[in-house]
Amino acid sequence: ECPVCHAKNAFNEVKGEIKLAAEHKFGVYAETVKNNPDISEEDKKYIFDQLMANFNGECSEVGMYLCMARIAHREGYPEIGLYWEKAAYEEAEHAAKFAELLGSDLESNMTASTEKNLAWRVDCEYGATAGKFELAACAKKNGLDAIHDTVHEMARDEARHGKALQ
């Protein structure tokens, strides 16, 4: 019965295991290309290199687009700034899809397990906090206030990420 209109035939009861018609998968490259004897080593290398290059390119675009958004906002172009932010998010989605295709071939610590990924990234965020703090201290020592202030704030962000993931 429909919970809104109370029609008797609005729903069909599902019995047994539910099967999804389609689903995203982690590590498609390893599953379909890496050990596939029907694909030449040359093509395997090309596919892997292009997946990696696209992942890295998409990640770079995220940073550049957000930088351009900040510039546009400072110059008084909020609509352009907001569009750059939207484009950056879309590029981040592209990077995520390349990462998902590459799976553990992108980063051996990355797995299809949320629990394992959380534990790994907590350690990474704590390491990133320390690394950025050291860079900020070096910048401060050399009188580079803009670099110090920006990187020190990023270190705090990394610490917050680590705490949140913990």
Descriptions of predicted regions:
Residues 1-166:
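Non-heme di-metal
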